[in-house]
Amino acid sequence: RDFQFHTDQIINHGYLSVDFFFMLSGFVIGYAYDDRWEKMNLWNFCKRRLVRLQPMVVMGMLLGGILFYFQGSEIFPNLAQTPVWKMLLVMTVGFTLLPVPVSLDVRGWSEMHPLNGPAWSLFFEYVANILYAMLIRKFTSRWLAVLVFLAGCALIHQCYTQGNNIGGWTLDAEQCRVGLTRLMFPFFGGLLLFRLCKPGRIRHGFWWCS
């Protein structure tokens, strides 16, 4: 039955892609910035990340606001009674990627970004970027490996005790714990992979990847 449920999903699938996204982000951060800190300060790093990520955030929230009242469904119980001013407030806050409290839930799913649900992962992406820039970039590969090991243990414990690895999109203590646990191992594991693996060249790599 569960198998049939998942095979019937054409678009809404690939749940673990979020965790892969975190690992890929960690690898890319290491590739793009690990060797630049002698010529770059914290403010330069933040500007680069904002320029890269924030336009996508604003566009996602804007589209979510425009299409908000067209997604009427019984799975979104709060949508019909949400006034326009409240939706606009949530959209405006969403432009900054700051999470909204449960009191501003406009869909009924207690999301920190109800106009663009997946944006919770970008919020944690920013958290990881800040941790990297302020502290973890200074770790040696050995200490980074220790951090990744501990984060992996925390992730295993969460999966074992919770029974799954679902959560991270609500602004409360429990969901933030789940989100941070989901973030730490793959993101800094990706950074560690970059530091341990020497980049190589593949002939005609562009065409193979295409």
What do these predicted ranges mean?
Residues 17-34, 121-137, 146-205, 210:
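Specific transmembrane alpha-helix
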Residues 42-47, 88, 116, 127, ...:
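Alpha-helical membrane-protein architecture signal
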Residues 43-53, 79-88, 204-210:
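Interfacial transmembrane-helix boundary/kink motif in multi-pass membrane proteins
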